[in-house]
Amino acid sequence: MNRNYLASSIGLLFACAIGAVAAQAAEPAADYKINPEYTSTSPDGATTVEQYARISADGDYTWQFWARRQDKLTLLKPEQPDYAAGFRFTSDSRWLVRMQKTGAGYASLYLYRLGPQGFVAATAKPLSDLAGAYFKRRPESRKIRKPDFHIEAGLVKGTDDNYRSLGQDWPDSRYLVISLSGEVSPNSRHGQLRSVRGWRCRYDLQKGTFDVPPDFAEINAKAIAPER
């Protein structure tokens, strides 16, 4: 048998084996059990987000999040210790936001988009990290004490009606409204301070950029005003 042919055949078999293993891995491991309480469905009914937990011998939880579409599962990374998550779809069912508690007083946001293979990460970093970095570049952030703990990012309710409930008239499934909060650790000069309390910005899903609409001016001024 020709050596080149043999090498090619072995390589092809190896690649097929790897592909088969990868295909088999596209589902939760046997020790992860679904918790139906946290299952959610997209507005068009085509995608279901399922949450699976693995419980260690010590009672510690590790959560995985899977999007099921046409009987195909895709993992919504990363997995999370201790806490289940909340999920919201845009009204066109093509974008998915994960609202993730990560600790006492801490919360992050992850953004996923619908692609040919199902839902995948839409940003290289968590959406909450990008929003926090945007806030730090804003001039108003230089007027306050910098939050250093209890950092929380939340998705403001309104994706289901494109924020018309907030009085907005934006294009369908175009924007997300994000709320940021954070505290300053106590020291010898002051106690624990909530220096940011629900500051809002808007994320453009088409452009991948942030801005602050004029309508947010009043609520944002209150969000960073000194506590009385």
Per-region residue spans from a language model:
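Bacterial N-terminal signal peptides that target proteins for export
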Residues: 1-11
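Bacterial N-terminal signal peptides
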Residues: 9-20
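Acidic, small-residue rich beta-repeat scaffolds with periodic aromatic anchors
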Residues: 19-35, 108, 116-228
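Beta-strand-rich domains and repeat architectures in extracellular enzymes and scaffolds
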Residues: 30-61
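Short glycine/acidic-enriched loop and turn motifs that connect beta-strands
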Residues: 55-58, 102-105, 183-187
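Surface loop/turn motifs at the tips and blade-to-blade linkers of beta-strand repeat domains
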Residues: 77-81
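Residue-level detector of Asp-centered blade-edge/turn motifs that repeat once per structural unit
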Residues: 91-92
